[in-house]
Amino acid sequence: MAKRDYYEVLGISKDASKDEIKKAYRKLSKKYHPDINKEEGADEKFKEISEAYEVLSDDNKRASYDQFGHDGPQGFGGQGFNGSDFGGFSGFGGGGFEDIFSSFFGGGRQRDPNASQKGDDLQYTMTLTFEEAVFGTTKEISIRKDVTCETCHGDGAKPGTSKKTCSYCNGAGHVAVEQNTILGRVRTEQVCPKCNGSGQEFEEACPTCHGKGTENKTVKLEVKVPEGVDNEQQIRLAGEGSPGVNGGPAGDLYVVFRVKPSETFKRDGDDIYYKLNVSFPQAALGDEIKIPTLNNEVMLTIPAGTQTGKQFRLKEKGIKNVHGYGYGDLYVDIKVVTPTKLTDRQKELMKEFAQLNGEEINEQPSNFKDRAKRFFKGE
């Protein structure tokens, strides 16, 4: 049977961070650990989770897996030839001897300066409330970024003027440069610094962008925040980065989320935790208590004899997984609260309870004032 995708096994996206990988592994390993989960198949599930984590938590193994999958080299099911086996020349980019001499002399073969290039990627940090992260929302943001000049439409020249042959390189787009090296004086070619390799220069530069072809502006964007995003997660807005060069595509905008903590719940991945204080009578006799969930309030049955530390699990009452893998759970942690102030009647009843339980209570004062009273009374 074919192996499942490691990212699918852990329930994470392919661009998940190390923290997201670790968090997903901890949650799943705790759920399917053979010492905890006795269901059939839990052991195999745990092995699958551990194998996925072993690969994705290691940068080298993860890179190899992303490139080759389960059947590629580096122990994922097959041994194949990899260009990295010739590691002796990797420091020069694997481009052969021309690139070795290019790196040595700082010149040599150059990239085509007129080739199209993708624009730079940008990053924006968005702060969300707990509720916005859980249920999703749409927010408008304002960012400063380079955009194509509206005056010259990215050409760089003043409208109505034309370009002429570069006076520095005579239209070649590159110039000869001589350098002193350990092997003597070497002649190389470099991109023309005046026309940046285009071979042309403006008769008159655009008055708005001064020949750059771009201008820096404040841009408003609408960002749709998906349900279930967590702190430090990010989404990619394709084409919303800086404009490309020479007709290349624009870069992307990455929106990174900072999620404020909830005053009611504690979050761990898709699971949420709620602390519930119960009184001594409620814990001893049992009760039904109304508790909050993400969407409404539900009744929770507290069995008689419940102790501090008891945890109740409400399945699928947690947060929707941002990648669509169901819902997390709501865990209710119980704390039995000891009363700090009792009426005389309540004290009598407590003493009577202790006597019926075969206990002899040596009552102690609760504060300095009570202790002082007992001292002066000679008790």
Curated annotation (Swiss-Prot):
Keywords: Chaperone, Cytoplasm, DNA replication, Metal-binding, Repeat, Stress response, Zinc, Zinc-finger. GO terms for biological process: chaperone cofactor-dependent protein refolding; DNA replication; protein refolding; response to heat. Its cofactor is Zn(2+). GO terms for molecular function: ATP binding; heat shock protein binding; unfolded protein binding; zinc ion binding. Residues 5-69 form the J domain. SUPFAM superfamilies: Chaperone J-domain, DnaJ/Hsp40 cysteine-rich domain, HSP40/DnaJ peptide-binding domain. CXXCXGXG motif repeats lie at residues 149-156, 166-173, 192-199, 206-213. Zn(2+) 1 binds at residues 149, 152, 206, 209. A zinc finger (CR-type) spans 136-218. CDD domains: DnaJ, DnaJ_C, DnaJ_zf. Belongs to the DnaJ family. The J domain is necessary and sufficient to stimulate DnaK ATPase activity. Zinc center 1 plays an important role in the autonomous, DnaK-independent chaperone activity of DnaJ. Zinc center 2 is essential for interaction with DnaK and for DnaJ activity. Participates actively in the response to hyperosmotic and heat shock by preventing the aggregation of stress-denatured proteins and by disaggregating proteins, also in an autonomous, DnaK-independent fashion. Unfolded proteins bind initially to DnaJ; upon interaction with the DnaJ-bound protein, DnaK hydrolyzes its bound ATP, resulting in the formation of a stable complex. GrpE releases ADP from DnaK; ATP binding to DnaK triggers the release of the substrate protein, thus completing the reaction cycle. Homodimer. This is Chaperone protein DnaJ. It comes from Staphylococcus aureus (strain bovine RF122 / ET3-1). The lineage of its organism: Bacteria, Bacillati, Bacillota, Bacilli, Bacillales.
